[in-house]
Amino acid sequence: MKTVRRMLYRDVVSSVAFVALAFLSLSFFIDFVDELQKIGRPGFTLWMAVAGAMLELPGNLYELLPIAVLIGTIYSMARLAQSSEFTILRTGGLSPLRALRLLALLGMVFSALTFAIGEYVVPFTERQTVLFKAALSGGRKLGSTGAWLKERRVSDQGERSYSVNVAGIDSRGTLVGIRIFEFDAEGRHLSRIIARQGRVGADSTWTLTDADFTTWPMGSDPSRDTVTRQTLPTLRWPSTLSAGVVSAAVLPLKTMSAVELWRYSEHLSDQEQASQRHRIQFWKKALYPLACLVLTALALSFAYLHARAGGISLKVFGGIMLGISFVLLNNVVGHIGLLRGWTPWLVAAMPSTLFMLLSLAAFGWLVRYR
């Protein structure tokens, strides 16, 4: 059985690696052509176009790896079936359950690889991509209104709420165009801070540069009090908004790991803000690696098709169609779940569960009737 396992694993891994390399080459070419349009801008060179396309590769690999696993495994299984090698293995004692177990173990390895890439490699490279593009464009603007964060605190003076607005980030990751508004429990405006830029420390303290600090009177007779205004070169603003929360608000979702997505969704819930989108993204990121296991089981069914049922090219084409349908279903269900307010984990698990049922049904039917 060790010989059978070694032969199957070597054949499947080499096929998956070839398909993944083909996908990455195609995606690199597309991204590189897209980056070439920027040549001619001040400071933008050909090597920058290559670097920009290279930074996109880990994210593309993460998204395409389950499809590469499906197509590569289908190709390997169909080739073994066409050459009657799989029939010989079945005659030698390779039962359907044992074959499913062997490929399930390999699928778990691919799932672990997908999880590691998505959790550790992709967030880092996506952040570098954002900073790289920000350096070329002079900073990254966060839409027309910027990114908004909320914070609530309870002190000796009562409950305070803060609304923080960040206009963008520069190439060094520094926050640009910061506005902080303070309100009391009754919604009265107490203070405002406008800073040119700032950074968030490890202790969640914001260090603001060129800050304009304005406070409004809190007395019973505001007409007798005066508004105070200070201009400070540096201002330290204590906060509970950590660097991770701020990064999640100002950077794209692709730059966040599953842990960061969960923490930010919890922060949004604590602040009574909409967290459905980030919870769905968290569950999709947590469950997406399992697609490799599901699609590996689906590919095993092609080994039980008779060689005369179609050539390898036809089976590979079927695998490509199945992979495209999985990606489309995964995206469509995510958008529908967000619009309809479905349970986040159910939205993320629905495509993989559906394909798992499909693969088991097809596998059982082929084993019994073919």
Question: Which functions belong to the PLM regions below?
Answer:
Residues 244-248, 356-370:
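A juxtamembrane structural motif centered on a specific transmembrane helix
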Residues 90-95, 340:
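Short helix-to-coil transition segments within interhelical loops
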Residues 243-272:
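Extended, hydrophilic extramembrane loops/domains of integral membrane proteins
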Residues 47, 107-222:
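Non-transmembrane, extracytosolic/lumenal segments of membrane-associated proteins
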